[in-house]
Amino acid sequence: MSKYLLAIDQGTTSSRAIIFSAQGLPVARAQQEFKQYFPQDGWVEHDGQEIWLSTLKVCREAIASSGLQAEAIAAIGITNQRETTLVWDAASGTPIHLAIVWQDRRTADYCAGLKDAGHEAMVSAKTGLLIDPYFSATKLRWILENVPGARERAQRGELRFGTVDSFLLWRLTGGKVHRTDASNASRTLMFNIHTQQWDQDLLELFDIPASLLPEVLDCAAEFGHAEAELLGASIPVLGMAGDQQAALIGQACFEPGMVKSTYGTGCFMIQNTGDQPVSSKNRLLTTVGYRLGGKVTYAVEGSIFVAGAAVQWLRDGIKLISHARDSEALAEATGEACGVYLVPAFTGLGAPYWDPKARGAIFGLTRDTGIKEIVTAGLQSVCYQTRDLLEAMRQDGAAAPSALRVDGGMVENNWVMQFLADILGVSVERPEVTETTALGVAYLAGLQLGLYPDLQAIASHWHRQQRFEPRMSETHRERLYAGWLDAVKRVRSEG
């Protein structure tokens, strides 16, 4: 009997479920967007109940549309938007506050105070991360400080903390299991990536009770069983990874030096660094790539907060386009030398700048500037930010990759992929299956199930759909990029 794997891909703007065959081919999928809440400048929230209900709905829809019986699903894998923070009642499973999303910057002043007090060196040495509102610890502390009675309830053991994966696992198992995986734990600012444990010094710094925290397992492990009444059968959850680490696996970047870049709401470039953590001198992050059989593979990551979100803003915020797909034709009609630079620092700048107080701007406007130039500049901003990350990796001593493997919704845009190759001066490879985040966590579940004997078996399923080669002259490339660097300098809060 064929084995099928259900991947839950809970993202920043939508929840998706994809059923894969053992060969890594999508059989059925379902997707549902959910509401974004922006209560104040720099604040971004989600409703945990909406996350759960949308996830349950797409799982049921995917199973129904596949024509399979629920019993044919051999295992579930969960991948998720990372860092987003939930705290819920241990008895009812009800969140005590809206989820604070990874993009949220409300703790910027608190983070600045920790840096001024000299704590960043210790935090970075233990976690591989920087002190920044992006990560979970300061979000969790904010909830404990600002929800009436939360800290007292946490100290009494009545509350649970989790990133989205942990919350979904709790709900799927009927509140029986409170676990996460090493890749998600490594993004909280509370997890020591060397000891692979929650760190007491960090918990004391952020004033977090240890009773809130989930158990940390490998990325392929026995996480628990989804209750039969939810999906029609009791299905084991055997894989779990943060979305970017899952994409690293889905892209089969198993050798040190291999690089993938995912283009969703944000953009995330990860380079496999092997069994040793590599510290960046250029404000990139050291993180857990994946942990299998107790063995950690580390990675260096650059995180950009706004990629696809820039196109979403062009569509929904200022309504220059009706559909995201319209952007490709407009860019083709404009060309790469549009003279306009859009810096989408809507919630600050991520790597390598880490400037939470920077704000977005458009430069180079003339009387002739129209919709197509601004839309093109929005697309180009994603590629320029990717170049920023690649430059930081090069300055850290990494060799230029022979190719950049790309995935995520934006990579369907051929114009963006060609401009990306041009501005990087590196070949860009788009795989046949671009849902690599979901595919990666399906592979993890399959690995635990025994469908795949090892990572090499998974790598054999990776196939390239198209390769984009650089066509731009170096002179033109560097002139365009210099204009971008000038634009970024102008929006920096430090000037």
Swiss-Prot record:
Pathway assigned in UniProt: Polyol metabolism; glycerol degradation via glycerol kinase pathway; sn-glycerol 3-phosphate from glycerol: step 1/1
GO cellular component assignments: cytosol
GO biological process: glycerol catabolic process; glycerol metabolic process; glycerol-3-phosphate metabolic process
Pfam short name (any one): FGGY_N
EC number: 2.7.1.30
Chain positions recorded as glycerol binding sites: 82-83, 134, 243-244
Annotated positions binding sn-glycerol 3-phosphate: 12, 82-83, 134, 243
Sorted UniProt keywords: ATP-binding, Glycerol metabolism, Kinase, Nucleotide-binding, Transferase
Catalysed reactions listed for this entry: glycerol + ATP = sn-glycerol 3-phosphate + ADP + H(+)
Classification via SUPFAM superfamilies: Actin-like ATPase domain
GO molecular function: ATP binding; glycerol kinase activity
Activity regulation, free text: Inhibited by fructose 1,6-bisphosphate (FBP).
Top-level enzyme category: transferase
InterPro entries, per the entry: ATPase_NBD, Carb_kinase_FGGY, Carb_kinase_FGGY_CS, FGGY_C, FGGY_N, Glycerol_kin
Function: Key enzyme in the regulation of glycerol uptake and metabolism. Catalyzes the phosphorylation of glycerol to yield sn-glycerol 3-phosphate.
Record family assignment: Belongs to the FGGY kinase family.
Record's protein name: Glycerol kinase
Biological source species: Ectopseudomonas mendocina (strain ymp) (Pseudomonas mendocina)
